[in-house]
Amino acid sequence: MTEYLLLFVGTVLVNNFVLVKFLGLCPFMGVSKKLETAIGMGLATTFVLTLASVCAWMVNSFILLPLGLIYLRTLAFILVIAVVVQFTELVVRKTSPTLYRLLGIFLPLITTNCAVLGVALLNVNQSHNFMQSAVYGFSAAAGFSLVMVLFAAIRERLAVADVPAPFRGSSIALITAGLMSLAFMGFTGLVKF
């Protein structure tokens, strides 16, 4: 149990996919202008990332490795992610039409989110078992969601702040992301791998 807790804390805080590995920057910058959209995108990404991580592990363990098709790993994972995203899109459309409208084009773009593919590939490279894959996928998504919600809250405050003209828009957003990355570096000594 301690192993899974360390994996969770280490992935969420110490090795955050956005701030440390720089994966998932497109939705991080694109969806983080409003807090409600960031929360919705975070929930959708959490569902997709966790499910895709587990499905990719199963495809790798039960199909690719036994058949010696390891060279098709990236292509197979992209197909798995596309299927999971389409399933998520159907679920969100049926359960929450408002959230579906808010997410707009960003929901299908989860398919091309490099963080989702990155988690699947890192699961395989780090030789995680089924449970570790599920925890790693969920914790990567939780870290992504945490950072995106924090960033969206900061950006909403910056929208009404008196920011100098040269720093308005993307400039202050990138500076803020850099400062968040520095803040998360404080967690570096928290978990030893």
Curated annotation (Swiss-Prot):
Domain of life of the organism encoding this protein: Bacteria
Annotated membrane topology: Multi-pass membrane protein
Main enzyme class: translocase
GO biological process: electron transport chain
Pfam families: Rnf-Nqr
Keyword list, A-Z: Cell inner membrane, Cell membrane, Electron transport, Membrane, Translocase, Transmembrane, Transmembrane helix, Transport
Membrane-spanning ranges: 5-25, 39-59, 62-82, 102-122, 134-154, 171-191
Localisation: Cell inner membrane
Keyword Cell inner membrane: yes
Enzyme Commission number(s) from the entry: 7.-.-.-
GO cellular component: plasma membrane
Assembly and oligomerization: The complex is composed of six subunits: RnfA, RnfB, RnfC, RnfD, RnfE and RnfG.
Known role: Part of a membrane-bound complex that couples electron transfer with translocation of ions across the membrane.
Family: Belongs to the NqrDE/RnfAE family.
HAMAP family named among the record's database cross-references: RsxA_RnfA
Protein name listed in UniProt: Ion-translocating oxidoreductase complex subunit A
Gene that specifies this protein: rnfA
